[in-house]
């Protein structure tokens, strides 16, 4: 998209991590999140979830109880995610550190293999997109111990947030945003914004995204720019504290 003609015909839909996290995990990115892209509108948001499988006893029903189980079983103190260097990776480790538990992160190439190992009992827990867990919860195959948003998700109102369970600093929601090539004229950006916001307001779009655990959320270009800066400013110190680099 950064090389596309800045006429509104090319629009990028990307998760926050590509713009707010990867600049800190990769020493050399082929793009500049600010200079190469023009914010158009937010698209959707979703929370993360912490799920456990059959390796964790049924008596464990909360994150504090999971941390106590890890302490009693240090050889099993593992947590997985779909990718190294992702927000999911960091949230899991921060959760352990806040509880005084040194968790080992196991990165998978995508969520499906991570879920398979959790269901098979070789991996105790997984930090993943909340929507990924919804069908598995309905089938009784996993237990969701926490969600990561500021409030309980409407998709899992019975599941307490991390903040409710004592992890006040672990309030995170991922977002998707629409971006045009950098340098796109403001009138063109606004036309794209109006079209996208109208599309996102359609009931079939709202319902379709809800199936995946996504909440529709549109915005002005400036609101998206402000959100990107806030995400960038928040994740930089987190990545530095974790000490992770994808290039190492």
Residue ranges and their predicted role:
Residues 1-6, 93-94, 98, 112-122, ...:
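Short helices/loops that flank or line small-molecule/ion binding pockets
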Residues 2, 64-67, 115, 119, ...:
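Non-transmembrane alpha-helical segments in soluble domains
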Residues 3-13, 73-77, 99-101, 119-126, ...:
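Alpha-to-beta junction loops
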Residues 3-9, 24-113, 162-164, 175-208:
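Hinge/capping helix and adjacent helix->loop/strand transition within the periplasmic-binding protein
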Residues 5, 15, 107, 121-122, ...:
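Conserved functional loop/turn residues at catalytic and ligand-binding sites
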Residues 11-14, 42, 108, 127-129, ...:
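Short beta-strand and adjacent tight-turn residues that come in two discontinuous sequence segments
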Residues 17-28, 94-98, 125-159, 236:
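A ligand-binding cleft/hinge motif common to bilobed small-molecule-binding domains
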Residues 101, 161, 186-248:
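An extracytoplasmic/periplasmic, membrane-proximal ligand-sensing/linker region
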């Amino acid at each position: 998209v950064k090389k596309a003609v800045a006429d509104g015909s090319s629009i990028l839909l990307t998760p926050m991590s590509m713009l707010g996290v990867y600049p800190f995990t990769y020493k050399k990115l082929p793009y500049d999140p600010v200079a190469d892209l023009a914010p158009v509108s937010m698209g959707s948001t979703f929370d993360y979830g912490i799920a456990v499988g059959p390796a964790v006893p049924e008596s464990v029903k909360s994150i504090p109880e999971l941390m106590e189980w890890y302490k009693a079983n240090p050889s099993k103190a593992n947590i997985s995610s779909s990718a190294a260097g992702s927000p999911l990776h960091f949230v899991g480790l921060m959760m352990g550190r806040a509880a005084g538990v040194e968790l080992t992160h196991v990165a998978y190439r995508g969520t499906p293999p991570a879920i398979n190992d959790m269901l098979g009992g070789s991996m105790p827990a997984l930090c993943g997109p909340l929507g990924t867990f919804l069908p598995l919860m309905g089938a009784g195959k996993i237990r969701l111990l926490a969600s990561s948003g500021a409030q309980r998700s409407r998709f899992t109102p019975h599941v307490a947030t991390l903040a409710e369970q004592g992890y006040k600093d672990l309030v995170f929601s991922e977002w998707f945003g629409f971006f045009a090539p950098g340098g796109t004229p403001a009138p063109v950006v606004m036309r794209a914004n109006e079209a996208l916001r109208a599309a996102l307001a359609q009931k079939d779009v709202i319902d379709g995204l809800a199936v995946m655990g996504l909440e529709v959320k549109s915005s002005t270009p400036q609101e998206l720019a402000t959100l990107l800066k806030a995400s960038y400013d928040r994740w930089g110190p987190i990545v530095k504290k974790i000490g992770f680099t994808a290039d190492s």
